[in-house]
């Protein structure tokens, strides 16, 4: 049987006060209202302090474990986004785009080197795991309300608001595992 499942992440405050205040957490009730009206059977939320990197990854894993072939999956992220220097040498522009969990810091320091940023390669792996579980008969829609989530609705170079500074990494600081180069989660995606 086809089940509708969702993960809703909303972050409006951060552990690090250097981040600007945003209202990602305020989006959650509106999204939940729509999902409930659409009769989603499983809805996982991850809000503010719950939305640490470990909390977000755990929520994705819980969702993935419950998914079955042909399910409909909706994933919503409202929060900060930031670019960091590419750590996997797989980005033409040399920048990774990141979701910013509650416990991620805006700038590198002696004690923080970006390990709490949720890098696009990691997000892609989490989404690929879900796609593999729901199969070709399933449907997945991902909505990202964050800076640096893409330029589909805005012109290149058009600054609206948000974080312009790039999180600078030193290659010896971080080691993330990632999927094979040139693998694209969207290559097998079906129309919603």
Show which residues each predicted segment covers.
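Glycine- and acidic-residue-enriched helix-capping/strand-helix junction motifs
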Residues: 14-29
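Eukaryote-biased recognition of electropositive, low-complexity segments
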Residues: 174-192
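Conserved beta-strand elements of the Class I
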Residues: 5-7
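Caspase-like (clan CD) cysteine peptidase catalytic core
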Residues: 3, 53-78, 83-159, 175, ...
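Short helix-loop-beta junction
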Residues: 26-42
């Amino acid at each position: 049987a086809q089940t509708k499942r969702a993960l809703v992440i909303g972050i409006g405050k951060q552990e690090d006060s250097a981040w600007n205040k945003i209202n990602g957490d305020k989006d959650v009730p509106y999204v939940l209202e729509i999902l409930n009206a659409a009769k989603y059977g499983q809805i996982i939320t991850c809000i503010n302090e719950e939305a640490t990197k470990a909390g977000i990854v755990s929520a994705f894993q819980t969702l993935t474990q419950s998914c079955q072939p042909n399910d409909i999956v909706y994933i919503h992220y409202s929060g900060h986004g930031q670019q960091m220097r590419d750590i996997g040498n797989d980005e033409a522009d040399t920048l990774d785009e990141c979701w910013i969990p509650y416990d991620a810091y805006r700038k590198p320091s002696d004690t923080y080197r970006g390990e709490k940023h949720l890098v696009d390669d990691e997000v892609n792996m989490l989404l690929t795991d879900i796609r593999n579980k729901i199969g070709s008969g399933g449907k997945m829609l991902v909505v990202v309300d964050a800076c640096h989530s893409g330029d589909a609705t805005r012109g290149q170079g058009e600054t609206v608001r948000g974080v312009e500074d790039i999180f600078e990494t030193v290659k010896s600081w971080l080691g993330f595992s990632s999927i094979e180069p040139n693998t694209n989660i969207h290559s097998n995606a079906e129309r919603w």
